[in-house]
Amino acid sequence: MIIAIDGPAASGKGTLGKRLAAHYGFRHLDTGVIYRAVAKALLDGGADLTDQAQAIAAAQGLDPGLFGDPALKSQTVGDAASVISAYPKVREVLVGFQRQFAAEPPGAVLDGRDIGTVICPDADVKIFVVADPGVRARRRALEAQARGEPADEAVILADILRRDERDKGRSAAPLKQAPDAVLLDNSNLDIEGGVRAAIAIVEAVRAGRRRV
C-alpha cells in the first residue's frame, strides 16, 4: 500500500506522514528532505543556486546518509531547496529514487508537494493537507525556537507565502491537490487530532468510502 501526502510548507504533512507510517508499520519518506540534502550540498560547496547544471549534478550525487542531518531543517536550506525543486531536470533525477522507495514492501508513506500527482499517481490513498498560513508560521516559529534558533513570525509568514506562490506557480510539478485526494485542513487540530483525522481518511478509502 502507498499513502501519498501532499501540502504546502509547514502544513503538518511531515508529522502526519511519520505517524501514519508508524501506525501501519510502513516505511516513511519525507521527500522534502531529498531536496534539502541536494540544496545543502550546493550551499556547502559554494555553488550558485541559479546554475541548474550544478544542481543537477548534486541531485545525481545524492547521499541518503545525509537525510538525518539536523542542518537540513534550517530556514536557509529550506529556501534553497524551494529554488532548486523548481528545476525540471533536478526533479527528473530524483523521481526514480522516490518511486523505488514507494514500491518496496510492505508499504510506504511519502509526503511532499507532488506525490499524489507525479511521483505516485496510482497511490492507494492520497491526502492533501492544508492549514492557515498564520498557523503554519506560528508552528514553524515554535520549531525554530525549540532548536534554539531566532524566529520572527512575521518574517516566517512572508517566507511561507513566497514559497506557496513559487510552489504553486512552477512549471515542473506544481503544488496542487490531486482530483482523487482527500482534503485535510488541520488549522484547528493539534497533532493527535490531525493523526486521527488522517487515519480516518485512510480507513474510509480502504473501505471504499470516498467521503469521510
UniProtKB/Swiss-Prot annotation:
The keyword ATP-binding applies. Belongs to the cytidylate kinase family. Type 1 subfamily. The keyword Amino-acid biosynthesis does not apply. Keywords: ATP-binding, Cytoplasm, Kinase, Nucleotide-binding, Transferase. GO terms for molecular function: ATP binding; CMP kinase activity; dCMP kinase activity. It catalyses: CMP + ATP = CDP + ADP; dCMP + ATP = dCDP + ADP. Its main location: cytoplasm. GO terms for cellular component: cytoplasm. It is an enzyme of class 2 (transferase). It comes from the Bacteria. GO terms for biological process: pyrimidine nucleotide metabolic process. Transmembrane segments: none annotated. It is found in: Cytoplasm. This is Cytidylate kinase. Its EC number is 2.7.4.25.
